[in-house]
Amino acid sequence: MPNPVRPAVQLKDIRKNFGNLEVLHGVSLSANEGEVISILGSSGSGKSTLLRCVNMLEVPNAGSVAIMGEEIALEHRAGRLARPKDLKQVNRLRERAAMVFQGFNLWSHQTILQNVMEAPVHVQGRDRKACRDEAEALLERVGIASKRDAYPSELSGGQQQRAAIARALAMRPDVMLFDEPTSALDPELVGEVLKVMRDLAAEGRTMLIVTHEMDFARDVSSRTVFLHQGVIAEEGPSSEMFAHPRTDRFRQFLRRDGGTSH
């Protein structure tokens, strides 16, 4: 059973600049083990940047990031971009916080099975036969076992995203990060990806999800965070936030998006 009080992810006072533009203004957020947190916000609110700071795809200019209690060591240099002090630590923690991208990011020259096996074998150094068996089981679990020998170009967008989820799961991560996983999909393919994500949530997976899927955020996530102009404008239990939004900003956001998935 997940420990409900242990933070799986802890962000403190995260600031991020792109040139002279500060897109995150001291954001703090923690996710306990087993929590599913949806991160909502308009385009440009900083939500994807915040998610990418978790595993150092974007390095914060200030603040701290900890994954499963281990803080990532950052070197802040006057007048220059911050950088991780220890790339080995970053790579190790990236294995614990696996990212699923909007654009799938599958290796085009590898089969789906090879894509899922690649990191466990070559990054984690695990046994190839065991990784193959696990990869096949994961493809079965996400409903694309029949596509194991196909290449990404032969799959629909929904199938590619399910393969990307299987690839992330193959790393045996403690935390799953989803950056708008359905935004690149045709509307009729969104449901098959959300079903896999619902199943993962039901298993007690720790998940941080940047999404525009309002129904998913309301019904599946335990907590919702609403970003506006680089700060958290509202956060709380999802059922309460959607039923009784406390801020005008979030109320307007729900009205504009209709409170339903697209």
Swiss-Prot record:
Gene3D superfamilies, sorted: P-loop containing nucleotide triphosphate hydrolases
Keyword Lipid biosynthesis: no
GO cellular component, one term: plasma membrane
Induction annotation: By octopine.
Keywords carried by this UniProt record: ATP-binding, Cell inner membrane, Cell membrane, Membrane, Nucleotide-binding, Plasmid, Transport
Source organism superkingdom: Bacteria
Chief site of localization: membrane
All residue ranges annotated as the ABC transporter domain in the record: 9-254
Binding site for ATP: G41, S42, S43, G44, S45, G46, K47, S48
Matches recorded under PROSITE patterns: ABC_TRANSPORTER_1 (PS00211), ABC_TRANSPORTER_2 (PS50893)
Keyword Transport in record: yes
Pfam families: ABC_tran
PANTHER family tied to this protein: AMINO ACID IMPORT ATP-BINDING PROTEIN (PTHR43166), L-CYSTINE IMPORT ATP-BINDING PROTEIN TCYN (PTHR43166:SF35)
Function: Component of the octopine active transport system probably consisting of four subunits: Q, M, P and T.
Protein name from the UniProt record: Octopine permease ATP-binding protein P
Taxonomic path: Bacteria, Pseudomonadati, Pseudomonadota, Alphaproteobacteria, Hyphomicrobiales
